[in-house]
UniProtKB/Swiss-Prot annotation:
PANTHER family assigned: PROTEIN-METHIONINE-SULFOXIDE REDUCTASE, PROTEIN-METHIONINE-SULFOXIDE REDUCTASE CATALYTIC SUBUNIT MSRP
GO molecular function, one term: metal ion binding
PROSITE patterns: TAT (PS51318)
Gene: msrP
Name of the protein: Protein-methionine-sulfoxide reductase catalytic subunit MsrP
Gene3D superfamilies membership: Oxidoreductase, molybdopterin-binding domain
Post-translational modification: Predicted to be exported by the Tat system. The position of the signal peptide cleavage has not been experimentally proven.
The protein's Enzyme Commission number: 1.8.5.-
Amino acid sequence: MARWRPDMAEREATPEALYLRRREFLALGAAGAVGLLVARGARAGEPSGAALQVARRVDQAGGETPTPWDSVTGYNNFYELGTSKEDPSRNAGSLRARPWTVTIAGEVKRPQTLDVDALVRMFPPEERVYRMRCVEAWSMVIPWVGFPLADLVRRLEPTSRAKYVAFQTLLDRDQLPGQRRPVLPWPYVEALRIDEATHPLALLAVGLYGRALPGQNGAPLRLVVPWKYGFKGAKSIVRITFLADRPHTTWNDAAPDEYGFYANVNPEVDHPRWSQARERRIGEFFRRKTLPFNGYAAEVAPLYAGLDLRKNY
């Protein structure tokens, strides 16, 4: 599996056509770029949204080709915006990502409420290319933009009692119309152990493909934990709480026999209704083998030494 590579080139993370067009934009300068947009119009399939300044780029997907923008932003699970894969992109316009604040509470020495833009200024974003494996046995490769969750945790100074970190999604039935239906117990909550939250791979994402997160992908702030199934990645986060005891989490409460608290990608532990041994990479015809911990076993397996991963799925 590919190791940390701080020298990854932009071309490696971006499909060639998009890479070349981005270089064309930069060569023209601001005024020329505006003219180019007017002349050509918006092109389907290209990243949209505000461009983000990225401090560095790191490929942690073993050189695998990133999933196209259209698929990453058009095939989503975000029940707050609808339960079909296409609903989130159709309904994302109702989500207002600014102004936005995140409340930090619980077992920390520095509880506070942070503006999301101030948060980004504190921690310069970097691009990380990660595999993403859904519990539904499909997967993508996504060039996220964000900062290590561990950096925020350290700044907040958790107390010695803090053993877990919970992440809560916005509760607003106007902005997130899917919350009008009781398909899940709202608001959505997910959580990590404190050692998982401080692992270098855990990311708070603010963008993808060099652009601000679209609403359907969890704007303006979402959790990315690449060795776990995608439902662990809380979207549109408004509250982060440090806790002494393991909290209730949404899918684990709704269907504990199907959605474990740990949710580590494990090809040897099947979902009750389907196998987890193989997965369908979006955009590919044939299914591929699922890797333990989604290919990140060398980095994260020591976190679970001595833990029965069949029982603690």
